[in-house]
């Protein structure tokens, strides 16, 4: 496969076409964000795997601020094209937006819009703020996610309108 990076690269299109024809090769990122009873925010992300990745490639998942980030204002996890998530340090930017006074919804929505504008990237985010407000938003075709608070009913969603 011809794999390229950048707004004009055709590599990601070829990968998407390949995965549409061969969904058995698709992997998925798993992200978790939480606010515990003491008010501590945390985030964790598991990579979608190494299928169709270049040898030696380091994705966004292990890089704090890129695919995973938490501070006292917000915690978030990203999924999508890792190179774009790395370039934007998207999860850190979401927390910094909340720290500057933006709502979590606005911070996530603005980061998603920026990544779509700058990279035409297929990405998604889950995030939670220090008040326990959770957000999931994406530009991918789908991003299954679920959330609950205390003893509340678990809410699970498979499809959400694209931003």
Where in this protein do the model-derived segments appear?
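N-terminal nucleophile
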Residues: 1-163
């Amino acid at each position: 496969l011809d794999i390229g990076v950048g707004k004009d690269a055709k590599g990601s299109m070829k990968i998407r076409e390949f995965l549409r024809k061969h969904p058995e090769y698709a992997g998925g990122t798993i992200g978790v964000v939480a606010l515990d009873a003491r008010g501590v925010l945390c985030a964790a992300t598991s990579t979608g795997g190494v299928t169709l990745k270049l040898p030696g490639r380091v994705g966004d998942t292990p890089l704090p601020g890129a695919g995973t980030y938490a501070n006292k204002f917000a915690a978030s996890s990203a999924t999508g094209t890792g190179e774009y998530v790395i370039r934007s340090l998207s999860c850190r930017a979401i927390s910094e937006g909340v720290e500057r006074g933006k709502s979590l919804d606005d911070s996530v929505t603005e980061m998603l819009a920026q990544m779509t504008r700058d990279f035409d990237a297929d990405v998604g985010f889950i995030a939670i703020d220090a008040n326990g407000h959770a957000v999931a938003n994406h530009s991918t075709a789908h991003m299954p996610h679920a959330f609950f608070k205390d003893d509340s009913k678990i809410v699970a969603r498979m499809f959400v309108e694209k931003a």
